[in-house]
Amino acid sequence: MRILGIETSCDETAASVVLRDEEGRGRILGDVVLSQLEEHSAYGGVVPEIAARAHVEALDALIEEALLRAGVTLRDIDAVAATSGPGLIGGLIVGLMTGKAIARATGKPLYAVNHLEGHALTARLTDGLSFPYLMLLVSGGHTQLILVKGVGEYERWGTTIDDALGEAFDKTAKLLGLPYPGGPAVERAAQAGNAERFDFPRPLVGDARLDFSFSGLKTAVRQAAQSLGPVTDQDIADVCASFQRAISRTLRDRVGRGLKRFRADFASVDQPALVVAGGVAANQTLRRTLQSLCDEHGFRFIAPPLQLCTDNAAMIAWAGAERLAAGLPADGLDAAPRSRWPLDSEAKALIGSGRRGAKA
């Protein structure tokens, strides 16, 4: 089956065509991603209205290009998958409405996909991974440890109780005057730094639960930067390196406890696996930390290619293909975008719920 995927949840506009064969193997036939980095860099972060307008301007052409690269037309597509949440509501509306229009015009089924499910299932596209497995989702908006039991079957074992890890990177970069996006800037600066100069806190280390916390670390970084007076390039490098060291040590404890729990709960799984997903998964220091941790616990470590860690439509198309193959019902044209949409939406919220519902 061939699935057209559409992704517009934040500041990347993307379209992709993915093939899923009868044996369940996946192949990306055509994939296009347009970053809005230039549009938002002057503001030091994503501006929702600018993002939505950019999606409107770019999406149609990107869909045409993805189809062209795949060598197919809309008649050859078996279904349409569009991100329906979580994310910025303006962008979600653009992508989902476009998906609905294509589905209506072609008579093909529509799958309104949870963006987080796209991340959760990417390892099955790239590595043919079998269920169950453990996923660490680390992005600008989410830090979660998730048990992936099957298509549509997810259980959050841990989540951030305050800032997501990607937020911590971005805010650290902003405090130090580094450019947007903050994650890559912090990683580059850290390469020349002394990771032992600052002893930053490791939030929740030793706690029996599997949740994460990064607001205290962010505060410690701010206090360290303010104590230095005029900050030199070496100071910035040392702060970034020490920050990454604290993150690595925190993840070793939090994720390590998750690996032990997986071993206990799924003793019959011969080759357990940890998958890392999300934009922060591109950080090489964190990848090395997780690889070492998996080696110690006898887990297979799977990190998708960098282009599939950040937002992309291939993972959305693949999630649609997985749902279609699993016999899950398609969505109607009344499917609504959701700014908040936890993967385990039927479960009790692990953290607070505001007026907009449970946090993802």
Curated annotation (Swiss-Prot):
As to how many cofactors bind and how, the note says: Binds 1 Fe(2+) ion per subunit.
Please list the residues that bind Fe cation. Answer: 115, 119, 311
Name this protein carries in UniProt: tRNA N6-adenosine threonylcarbamoyltransferase
Gene name of the record = tsaD
> Which InterPro entries does this entry report, sorted A to Z?
ATPase_NBD, Gcp-like_dom, KAE1/TsaD, TsaD
Q: Which controlled-vocabulary keywords does the entry list?
A: Acyltransferase, Cytoplasm, Iron, Metal-binding, Transferase, tRNA processing
In Gene Ontology terms, what is one molecular function of this protein?
Answer: iron ion binding
Q: Which PANTHER family match?
A: TRNA N6-ADENOSINE THREONYLCARBAMOYLTRANSFERASE (PTHR11735), TRNA N6-ADENOSINE THREONYLCARBAMOYLTRANSFERASE, MITOCHONDRIAL (PTHR11735:SF6)
Task: Note the Pfam families from the entry.
Answer: TsaD
**Annotated GO CC locations:** cytoplasm
Q: Which domain of life is it from?
A: Bacteria
Localization, UniProt? Cytoplasm
Give the E.C. number(s). 2.3.1.234
What does this protein's UniProt record list under function? Required for the formation of a threonylcarbamoyl group on adenosine at position 37 (t(6)A37) in tRNAs that read codons beginning with adenine. Is involved in the transfer of the threonylcarbamoyl moiety of threonylcarbamoyl-AMP (TC-AMP) to the N6 group of A37, together with TsaE and TsaB. TsaD likely plays a direct catalytic role in this reaction.
Q: Which co-factor is required? A: Fe(2+)
**Which SUPFAM superfamilies does this one have?**
Actin-like ATPase domain
Source organism of this protein record: Rhizobium meliloti (strain 1021) (Ensifer meliloti)
Q: Which HAMAP family match?
A: TsaD
Q: Which GO terms describe its biological process?
A: tRNA threonylcarbamoyladenosine modification
Q: Where does substrate bind?
A: 137-141, 170, 183, 283
Catalytic function, reaction form = L-threonylcarbamoyladenylate + adenosine(37) in tRNA = N(6)-L-threonylcarbamoyladenosine(37) in tRNA + AMP + H(+)
UniProt lists the family membership as follows: Belongs to the KAE1 / TsaD family.
